Amino acid sequence: MNAKEIAKKIMDSSHVGTMATVEANKPFSRYMTFYHEDFTLYTATSKKTEKVDELEKNPNTHILLGYNDEGYGDAYLEIAGTVTISDEVRLKKKIWNEHMKPWFDGPEDPNLVILKVSPDAIRVMNKKGESPETITF
């Protein structure tokens, strides 16, 4: 498989990853649940979070996704991207699932926003002894 095929396979099977933002020149990471179309990632959050404040100031993010098996040599992705914050109801309905109910009243909840991550580069790591490979967009 080539790097794009490996990345797509990891994105299809891995939904929980870390998302980093920057505040006062310091990185902050948190676990997020991701959905994707092609190589664009989407994740839901409340517009009242620190991460939204941070992304409004600096839309750059770094995401780790994958590393699901034993933890030794598992392939994973390092994704550098730019975030767009959307409150578009069509997109919220598309991303909505029942797991979001504890935090939101539904896809039309005014506090729900979708973070759209457009990748600048995806680095495929730990490919069974092969060197990392970077996909640029």
Language-model regions, residue ranges each:
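Charged, gly/pro-rich active-site loop segments
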Residues: 75-137
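Charged, amphipathic alpha-helical segments
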Residues: 2-4, 48-49, 98-100
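Short, surface-exposed beta-strand-loop junctions and turns on beta-sheet-rich folds
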Residues: 49-51, 70, 130-132
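Extreme N-terminal tail/first-helix region
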Residues: 1-17, 136-137
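Short, intrinsically disordered, mixed-charge
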Residues: 54-61, 97, 101
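Short Pro/Gly-enriched beta-strand edge/turn motifs at strand-loop
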Residues: 13-18, 95-99
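Structural motif
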Residues: 40-41, 60, 82, 121
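Short beta-strand segments
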Residues: 14-48, 55, 62-67, 75-78
